């Protein structure tokens, strides 16, 4: 069964908009676990516009499910990973000023850099994942780095879903089958929601994990957090 990791960045964004500690990121993350989330994801950025370094330390002390930290692996990020030692690190090539992650790695162009990162994170006992698009050659290059997993960037799927869902998912079906044949685990994330998640998961039998934040938190405004997580888990219970 595909695991659900809840990205709590949006909770931090809401807190930071007003100051103080409401909503409490740690409490929400622990409630997510209690309500059935199988992991917690954060994406700390240098300007701390949502998740702060202090949040990452607090979460590490308290979480009982898998902790996934994603981000651009600059020196500051690498030091944070060394100190926290999460279960998984997802390497994302986003610039500091982007609103949200909007592209995967060109692995061939960054091959040596990614190889060094994978080797270092493995030395610290951390599972690695490379954020990537569906290009098959790019996935082959990712496998050569020694990474454990890839995370498929799913915004193109979500954007095209209502136009032609079969065509939208097909590149991901091919990509996941290719990755699986190379021994890679497969994660996915970006704009997955209650509308498009089940169809996606049904067609990717090797899908290990999805990380979902924005849509899940938006749904929770109407449904409540516990019911929302239950519904997302239900979409993945294939």
Curated annotation (Swiss-Prot):
CDD domains: PNPsynthase
Residues forming the catalytic site: 43 (proton acceptor), 70 (proton acceptor), 190 (proton donor)
Protein name: Pyridoxine 5'-phosphate synthase
Keyword Cytoplasm attached: yes
Localization, UniProt: Cytoplasm
One record GO biological process: pyridoxine biosynthetic process
Enzyme Commission (EC) number: 2.6.99.2
Subunit and interaction comment: Homooctamer; tetramer of dimers.
Gene Ontology molecular function: pyridoxine 5'-phosphate synthase activity
Cellular component, GO, one term: cytosol
